[in-house]
Amino acid sequence: MSVMNTFSGKKFDPMHMNSEDVSLEDLAHALSLLCRGGGHLKYFYSVGQHSINCMKEARARGWSKRVQLACLLHDASEAYIADIIRPVKAHLPEYYKIESKIMTCIFDKFGLGDLSEEENSRWKQLDDEILDHELRELMIGEKDRPVKSLASVPDMTERNWKDVAEKFIILAEALIKEK
């Protein structure tokens, strides 16, 4: 059994984790320190900040608190198994299985284990739409990338990871109480 250590001091095997292993503190900390796009951006922009932008777009569209929370947590598995860029991830079917198992634990932990197909499609849609805006803004050579209009203005400024982690926790705790 391979054990990982998390920021909060938890120790568990990520290949056999359960919802009790999930910690909001660990998610916020790790996601705020992981750079999007494999680090090939104009400056550091975290998975945590991306997740906050997705959640704020869901809120601006008037979507349910459950969908807003799902948007905030949609990349949370990356806190435990890091991020792999889409062009590579598409060739790693085993990664998808592991990611899915971990996401099930995370969604179960926060009461989202019963998301409907429509609710899941909404957070996936926003993930793609925000990604297009991020690519246009943060990657060299993508300035002319076509993007869909958003209801919000994503914050893609360079942010301190501690501020992102704190905001992630505040938003998550509020949504958990309200959903």
Regions found by a protein language model. Name each.
Residues 1-179:
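Metal-dependent phosphohydrolase cores
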